Amino acid sequence: MQCRLCWIKPESAVTATSPTHVKLAPLAAGSALPIFLFRMSIRNLDSLFDPRSVAVIGASERPFSVGGTLWRNMHGSGFAGPVYPVNPKYKLLSGQPCYAHVDDLPEAPELAVICTPAATVVDLVRQLARRGTQAAVVISAGLTAEQKQAMLDAAKPTLLRVLGPNCVGLLAPHAKLNASFAHIPARPGELAFVSQSGALVTAMLDWAEARQIGFSHFVSLGEHADVDFGDMLDFLASDPRTRAILLYIESIEQARKFMSAARAAARNKPVIVVKAGRSEQGQKAAASHTGALAGADNVVDAAIGRAGMLRVDSLEELFLAAEILTRFKAPIGDRMTILTNGGGVGVMAADAAAAHGVPLVELSQPLIEDLDQVLPANWSRGNPVDIIGDAPAQRYVDALEGLARHPQDTGTLLFIHAPTAIVPSTDIARAMVPVIQPPKKRALPLISAWVGGPAVAEARELFMQAGIACYDMPEQAVAAIGMLQRYARNQAELSEAPPATQLHNGSTPDVASVRKLIQDVLASGRDMLTEPEAKAVCEAYHIPVVITRTVPADAEAAAAEAARIGFPVVIKILSEDISHKSDVGGVVLNLQDADDVRAAAHAMLGRVRKSFPDARIDGFTVQAMVKRKQAQELIIGASIDPTFGPVILFGQGGTAVEVMKDSAMALPPLNAPLARALIDRTRVARLLKGYRDVPPADIDAVVATLMAVSQLLADVPEVAELDINPLIVNHEGAIALDARVRVSSQLPAGAASFAIQPYPAALAETVEWRGQPLTLRPIRPEDEEHHRAFLESLDPEDIRMRLFYSRRTMERSELARLVQIDYTREMAFIATVPDDGGQEKTLGVARALADPDNFGAEFGIIIRPELKGSGLGRILMDKLIRYQRGIGTQQLTAVVLTENRRMRKLAEALGFRETETPNDETTLQLLLELQQPARQP
């Protein structure tokens, strides 16, 4: 497969050196995010990738040994600094002195590469740490768990970072660093590749070299005892040489660290993932439908999407995705229109669209009538838009302009051309290019497939020069559109920041009653709630449930209760030992009178005792028979993933739920947009939107149920598994017919264990200020427009004092990054008061961004110019300092202009000390030790 794509921008110089290698010049000045965005400090990782000196411990002259290969790679890479071999067997190696021990080296190497037996690694790391080495690559394999821990213990006191063990090493081509035993070097480029698999590292290098693909960094994590995916994502997110990050993942261990780093990186540049190791282990041990459906791979899928990354299935797709995501800048439509001169290639594209989940547009009548004016009578009058093989160049232009007049009815346009003898393909391209240039004025996002070889080569080149994505085959183009659409959806999920506690209708759940019920169940030695208990939990969270009563295992008692409820009814077996009642004949529906109930109860007891003789029979549940016309059966559930913590499931329900396998997973917390996105990832979502004579279902009711389950998981850590199955829904609403809940006091659950930290609503407070209430709270995505108004109100001189240049306007993407923050590592407190219209008015913001290890955080503060001297800055800084101190941050720092007297005075009053900025007389550094007693005003 070949992908030929260039994206031409006026401020960029682009050279296509091969079909899959495109080199872009650095972005123009001023394209960096301007306000309150600080570069993350990745402690000592720069010593891994850009060291001043390197030692190869275990270097050898043996041609086929790891030490020999590593020495030749490092010594011959063109690295500018000194490279020291360490091996007591040699006096000279490659004509230079070889040192017997680490202590014999003339200086402390900034980076050490260790390729000696496992038993030697701990002592070597200890020696290197003592000498002052900042980073080590441990190639050695076979370390025991105890040895790995001892290695980390030896490295920790001096913050020496360790890559590995059991890894191939790393390559940083721009630094001419090849600290690996790979068989070939990597070309310089703009892609970073990070892999857990060593074998894949070498295979990928070979594959990429054949296609002239270059890399900024190429990293084998090995067993990632220290440096892991989270560290690499943090480092690469702010690396200016890296345009996209490619990951090969087999397992993830620290979910919150990974998600926090992934979300931060995905806000800056595309992050594309190949995830291997699909496992069914979780299904085998599951006691619920949700557990059986929530395999580890489904959860990882949900995590990748929620972090704004894109998952692909192969190495080939990895590079296709990297190419299209880094070059295609137009907004992608959620549907596609195909414009072609050939029916066959159009059908191929339509088939590919179905396979990739790319919906085709149904052409509107106004659009059809518009195209009727410029196309022959026998055109397809549908999608694909087939303009017939004899089309002259002007017909292509007319069709394109006709579609562009209806952008809302067209979506993304896929143009497919097959060469004909009627008109040269080059003439068609020349005629179309003026219509599609420049990109900023293009009405439609456009991707093309010029099918063929020499006959379309020049036409393809013309489109590439016009900044249009070009592919050889329709299937490739459709796959690219599918990737763009999935990526856009994931990026939309990335921008959501729901609180942990938020019901859809604003109501408050009865958390206390649920906690008491569950504590009573656990105290009794049970871990499964009865059906009535599970439904009581649902009712406490305002999830509608069917009327359900419990009776002893007696047919007469069941008949009497049924009469009180009213016929028709359903009876079910009540047993702690039976999870899926239908499997043992433990459910009978639509019983019309007392005689039916008696007969069903007797028969049910016989069936259950025969098929499950050891089960404890606690009685029956009797419930009203709910009949809803044209209703769908759904499942909503939750379980605890061992890595990512609580997860939520939605899908098609009923007894065949595991057979249908129409479900999707999401990580809590959920708000309404995230709940709707979860629903839309299933096939049953199309049925819920209505079809033929079936009206659309009440999707709001389903959304409310999903949000209620999300809040339940946050409020009650003891919930280990939950099934609401079926939840039936139609246009009248939703109601739960059955529910199961398993509880445990041993699982790490609740909001504190969410892989994505919820919006910290509990941090909001109101204080008295100038005779009025002042709200201090964390910023949230919904603040975007208020924050824009705040920034536009600032005085340019104040902005210069804080940001060192004057600028008040910004792009929406820049503004979004200020209000869509990751509360795991960043905090922004805003101060607000009501304006004359009762809306919140932002008066100031104090922001801090912490290192990944939370050792230090850099802060910034800015307030409205008319409020200088009002005490607002002190209030905001006090709030920020209390928060950072409370989460264990050690130091709070900032860089200020020397002339910024007002900020310096405030900082002094708060206990900050000033130090000079090296080589810069215009700025000073402010530092506050947070874990020391606060200075009193």
Regions found by a protein language model. Give the residues of each.
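A short, sequence-level motif marking secondary-structure junctions
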Residues: 2, 592-594, 742, 779-782
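Long, contiguous binding/interaction regions
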Residues: 749-937
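Low-acidity, Ser/Thr- and Arg-rich intrinsically disordered low-complexity segments
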Residues: 3-12, 18, 31
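Short beta-strand element of the conserved SAM-dependent methyltransferase core
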Residues: 571, 622, 741, 831, ...
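Leucine-biased recognition of intrinsically disordered, low-complexity hydrophobic segments
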Residues: 5, 24-27, 33, 37
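Catalytic-core regions of core metabolic enzymes
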Residues: 36-739, 747
